Every structure is written in structure tokens, then in C-alpha cells.
Amino acid sequence: AVVYSPALRLRNPLSMLLPLLKHVAPFWAKPKDTLTDPEAVRHLWSYPTFPTRAGHELLKLQRQVRRDLPRVTCPLLIVHSTRDDQVHPGSPHRVHDRVGSRDKELLLLHNSGHALTVDKEWEVVAERTYAFIQTRLGPRHQGSDGHAAGT
């Protein structure tokens, strides 16, 4: 499995108020994208706000995931950027330390924002993701050229 920018905890401390906010403010303005590549924004689309009810559901999901991390035993690649302004900086380390997988890697990037699959280091993300999956598939899933069969 591969996880990008794992949001076990959000960086914004006000996110903890979402269980209350959902009753008085149905929407919360999203922060401005902080991508390091100005061209990357062309690859993203989203609403300018998000429903606070959905944010509250995310908080509940985060609690459940934190409880279940030790049960995850598949190979795991965790990719996170130190410049991510959405996810708490301790989240990827907590996933790495608490997950039950023995085969796990933490890749920290230093020149991308939250949307690291389209930002400046997207090629590193793609290459490391591909390599991680390929090495775990084994030779029977590879064609004669060393790539995944059928690609």
C-alpha cells in the first residue's frame, strides 16, 4: 500500500472545533494552495470551501485509523512533504511507528506542498511509488523488459 500525506492529524488547531462548528457554520473556507510549483495548480480542482460535517467525519475517521494502525501488516510506503501545511508534521512518523507492517518506508520530501503528486517533486513520488510496488510484486508479475506485465 502507498499513502500520500497521511492526515492522522490536521495542522490547523481549529479543526478540533469541527464537532461544534458543523452546527453553526455549514462550510469552512479552504486555505490557499501552497504549492511550490506555480504550474501545479493547473492539475488541481476543488471547491473553495468544504462542509464542516465532512470535516467532523474526518476527525472520527482519524481516531479509528489511529486505533487500527497496528492491524495494518501489508508493505507500506508513506510519502509526506515537510512543507505540507494541511497535515500535522508528526502524522507520517506516527503512521510509520505505529503500523504493524515490518516492510515499511517513510519518504520525506522537502520541496512540495500538500498535493505532492502534482507539485515540484511529483516525478520522485511517481518513481518511488512505482519502484516500491514493483519490488514487492516479484518477477512473476514483470514482463521481459522488467516492467509490470501489460504496461
Regions inferred by a protein language model and the residue ranges of each:
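Catalytic histidine neighborhood in serine/cysteine hydrolases
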Residues: 93, 97-115
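Active-site nucleophile elbow and catalytic-triad environment of alpha/beta-hydrolase enzymes
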Residues: 51-68, 74
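A catalytic-pocket lid/entrance helix-loop region that shapes and gates access to the active site
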Residues: 16-32
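Short beta-strand/loop motif that positions the catalytic acidic residue
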Residues: 72, 78-80, 84
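Catalytic active-site module of serine/aspartate enzymes centered on a nucleophile-bearing elbow/loop
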Residues: 111-151
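Short alpha-helix in the alpha/beta-hydrolase fold that links the catalytic acid
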Residues: 74, 88-97
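Active-site nucleophile loop of the alpha/beta-hydrolase fold
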Residues: 2-13
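Short glycine/proline- and acidic residue-enriched helix-loop micro-motifs
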Residues: 35-49
